């Protein structure tokens, strides 16, 4: 299978050869969800992955705290996208921007690194890639790690917002009977089928197709 955007994914062997490249900046995006399935009004507690980062990370990597620094914490929902000015400043302050090639990775799942990839895309920054397999694959291959914390100097970030990256519920609702739109549920099948009440109201958006994406990604599909 050929990827439409092959530059969006890099392999561990490639990154190993870039560790001394000053134009490559690496970020651990790990976030941990502690599910509280008996409390549907609060389906999970969020924990930063910083403690895991301190134990082991790719040499030179800095850490990004998704909930604290890259979300709208005035929202009642976790991980709500902040306004573009705030987000651009957060990226810039953490060293993300010109002229650097940014590598995002996470532990125990790709969804955290892909979230940062999408947010950077939303602001128009294109020099970004995701480490295929994350740090789990890096460690499986026996590649070097370290435990000291790292940070990068701020970078120049000129945002050019792409409003087609994220949409609101009104847009989704209006697209439900639009033959040119496809809705895909990337959550596990038990949530799609309404067999798991984790998020309070079981089930899915009508007319939705599930791709079992979580299983496919975990299995390399």
Protein language model regions, located:
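Thiolate-centered catalytic microenvironments shared by cysteine-dependent enzyme domains
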Residues: 4, 74-175, 196
């Amino acid at each position: 299978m050929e990827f439409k955007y092959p530059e969006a994914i890099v392999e561990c062997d490639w990154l190993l050869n870039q560790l001394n490249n000053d134009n490559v900046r690496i970020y651990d995006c790990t976030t941990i969800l502690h599910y509280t399935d008996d409390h549907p009004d609060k389906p999970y507690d969020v924990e930063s992955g910083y403690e895991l980062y301190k134990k082991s990370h790719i040499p030179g990597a800095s850490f990004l705290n998704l909930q604290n620094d890259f979300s709208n914490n005035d929202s009642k929902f976790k991980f709500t996208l902040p306004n573009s000015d705030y987000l651009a400043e957060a990226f810039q302050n953490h060293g993300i921007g010109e002229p650097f090639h940014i590598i995002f990775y996470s532990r125990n799942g790709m969804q955290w690194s892909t979230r940062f990839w999408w947010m950077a895309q939303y602001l128009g920054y294109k020099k970004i890639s995701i480490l295929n397999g994350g740090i789990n694959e890096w460690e499986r291959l026996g590649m070097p790690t370290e435990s000291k914390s790292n940070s990068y100097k701020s970078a120049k970030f000129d945002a050019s917002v792409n409003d087609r990256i994220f949409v609101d519920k009104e847009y989704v609702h209006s697209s439900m009977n639009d033959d040119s739109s496809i809705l895909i549920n990337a959550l596990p099948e038990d949530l799609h089928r309404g067999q798991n009440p984790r998020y309070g109201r079981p089930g899915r958006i009508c007319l939705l197709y599930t791709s079992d994406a979580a299983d496919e990604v975990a299995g390399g599909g």
